[in-house]
A protein has these predicted regions:
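Twin-arginine (Tat) signal peptide motif
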Residues: 10-19, 357-360, 420-426
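Beta/alpha (TIM)-barrel catalytic core signal, keyed to glycine-rich beta->alpha loops juxtaposed to Asp/Glu
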Residues: 175-374, 381-403, 428-429, 433-438
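Short Fe-S-cluster ligation motifs
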Residues: 384-423, 452-455
Length: 455
């Protein structure tokens, strides 16, 4: 064990002090950017950015100097549809990736299924212009693989798509059920194959991304495998939520001194447009800090977090997030506690815990699951969900009108919730463990009830 890690484990210190002992801030000359389209986020973003390079974190297991901000390559801008139906809008995506690289982002996370297989090629196309030892590329073995031969073919294709000879970080993707892991990775021998690829040097660090329960997590860590890192969902809203267990997962990894890669730090964007009461709490503490910065800094303020992935879809997201991690300073313990209080305030409302990952898609009956949940949650975030049991005053009528108009404009008639027959093929795919037909029924009943009152 390194002296640095021994100190972190053995010396009493605050969470902020522990992080400062591991973070290396790297500052360089300013890098400008011309203005682009109006930000989608509700808070003002300075497109030019403040310049400088994002701070680095040293991986104590192998010495990698990894940017605290990692580029999640699942939410690139698209044309002709969304991430499932459209294709990557290549020029703005290239500009975003190049800007991030120039600002010091050196960790790029892609996967077989992202953008229907086009993410890997897009990332490889951009990164090939840079020295191979100047960035870290992460890819994943998809759940779609069923046999060892399929896994070998997929791995070879991934290297080819990305235009590289090795992956710096490679993951068993989206582990959520023990029998699935046993069938593919143990019975089919795919885990041993990946370990062999690691011995050959085509995988430098091997880990897994996780979406299951605590028992499965402990079982995975108990396997006779030397995992190099683990990727978990982590955000301030779910941290102390017993149904989400993210705090317990992090603590188990910290006990084993395993580097943590964070996914969904902004919860699929749902921690951007916060309820007004929560926004007020945070702004009273720091009027200049955006909701995205609060979410990203929360995750990076834990000492065993190596990098925080953000699935950025607009240039202003990239600029803002790079600014957040330039000359990075962790949140204070008081600010961490403020976020815990904010989470309690947030949970006083009811929201559908969808992160818009699209893993549930496509629906065999063409229900636009993500679009329905997105519309419902946006009304919730804007505090515009109508309550049919409340007084039918002007405010209720306004909320009813907003919900029905948004539902009509954002969800096509042949993709609405009433088309769900409850086959439940979608729920096992959901990383948030949602029972999707139940949530669709909830939306359908609300929409239908206020629609009947409209007549």
């Amino acid at each position: 064990m390194s002296d640095q890690k021994k100190n972190i484990l053995s010396t009493p210190m605050t969470r902020a002090e522990a992080l400062r002992s591991m973070v290396a801030g790297v500052v360089a000359g300013a890098f400008g950017l011309s203005a682009c389209s109006e930000p989608k986020r509700t808070e003002q973003v300075t497109i030019a950015g403040k310049g400088g390079r994002v701070s680095l974190k040293r991986n104590p297991r192998n010495g990698d100097e990894v940017s605290l901000l990692g580029f999640g390559c699942m939410r690139f801008p698209t044309v002709g549809g969304d991430r499932y139906t459209g294709r990557i809008d290549r020029e703005p995506t290239r500009e975003m990736l190049e800007y991030a690289y120039e600002r010091g982002v050196n960790y790029y996370d892609t996967a077989w299924m992202y953008h229907r297989g086009d993410s890997e090629g897009m990332v490889g196309e951009v990164l090939k212009q840079y020295p191979r030892d100047s960035f870290f590329l992460a890819d994943k073995m998809p759940p779609e693989a069923k046999t060892l031969e399929q896994a070998k073919e997929i791995f070879a294709t991934q290297l080819q798509r990305c235009g590289v000879e090795y992956f710096d970080y490679y993951l068993c993707h989206s582990i959520s059920r023990q029998y699935v892991f046993q069938n593919l990775y143990l019975n089919e021998g795919v885990l041993e194959y990946l370990l062999e690829e690691k011995r050959r040097g085509r995988i430098r660090q091997l880990g897994f991304s996780f979406h299951g329960d605590l028992a499965l997590f402990e079982w995975l860590l108990a396997l006779p495998v030397e995992w190099d890192f683990v990727q978990i969902q982590m955000n301030w809203l779910d941290w102390r939520d017993e149904t989400r267990i993210s705090e317990k997962l992090y603590n188990l990894l910290a006990e084993r001194e395993l580097p943590v890669i964070v996914m969904e730090p902004i919860r699929g964007g749902s921690l951007i447009d916060l309820p007004q009461s929560v926004t007020t709490m945070l702004r009273e503490n720091d009027p200049a800090m955006t909701a995205a910065a609060w979410a990203l800094k929360f995750c990076a303020s834990y000492p065993y977090v190596l990098t925080v992935l953000s699935g950025m879809s607009r240039m202003e997201h990239v600029v803002e997030n790079c600014d957040t991690f330039t000359d990075f300073q962790p949140l204070s313990d008081e600010q961490i506690e403020l976020l815990h209080r904010a989470a309690e305030q947030y949970r006083n409302n009811t929201r559908i815990d969808c992160t818009d990952c699209l893993y549930c898609m496509p629906c065999p009956y063409e229900v636009d699951i993500a679009g329905i949940f997105r519309t419902y949650n946006r009304c919730f975030d804007d505090q515009l969900l109508p309550n049919p049991d409340s007084a039918h005053d002007e405010e209720y009528l306004r909320r009813r009108r907003v919900l029905l108009n948004r539902y009509k404009n954002n969800v096509k008639p042949d993709g609405r919730a009433e088309r769900c027959i409850g086959c439940n093929q979608c729920s096992p795919k959901c990383p948030q463990s949602l029972h999707i037909p139940t949530e669709l029924k909830r939306v359908e009943e609300l929409v239908e009830r206020v629609r009947q009152e409209w007549k």
